[in-house]
C-alpha cells in the first residue's frame, strides 16, 4: 500500500508542476499575443503599401498560432488535464500555411507543404469521426 500512495503522491506533484509550467507558458504566450497585436497595428497603419500586405498576412497567421496555443492550454485544463489531438492538428495546419505564405519561392516545396496540409486535414477528419472522438 505504501508504494501505491507514494506513486500517487509523485504523480500528483508532477501534475502540479506541469500545471504551473503550462500556466507560465500561457502567460508568456499572452504577452507575445499582445506584442503581435501592437505589431499588426503598426503594420496596418504605419507601413508603406508594398511590404505591408505580406507583413500583415504573416502577422495575422502568427497571431492565430499564438491564439491556438493559448486555446490548447485552456482546453487542457477544461478537459481534465488532457490535450485534444485536433488542436495540435489545427496548429500544424496553421504553421504550414504560414510557411507557404512566407516561403513560396520553390513550387515543389509549396506542393509538398500543400500535401502535408491535405494529410493533416484527412487526419483531422478521421480524428473527429465517432469512433475516435473522445470529447
UniProtKB/Swiss-Prot annotation:
GO terms for cellular component: plasma membrane. Its main location: membrane. Pfam families: PsiE (PF06146). The chain crosses the membrane at residues 20-40, 54-74, 82-102, 107-127. InterPro entries: P_starv_induced_PsiE, P_starv_induced_PsiE-like. It comes from the Bacteria. One of its GO terms (biological process) is cellular response to phosphate starvation. It is a multi-pass membrane protein. It is found in: Cell inner membrane. HAMAP family: PsiE. Belongs to the PsiE family. NCBIfam families: PRK02833.1-2, PRK02833.1-3. This is Protein PsiE homolog. It comes from Yersinia pestis. The gene is psiE.
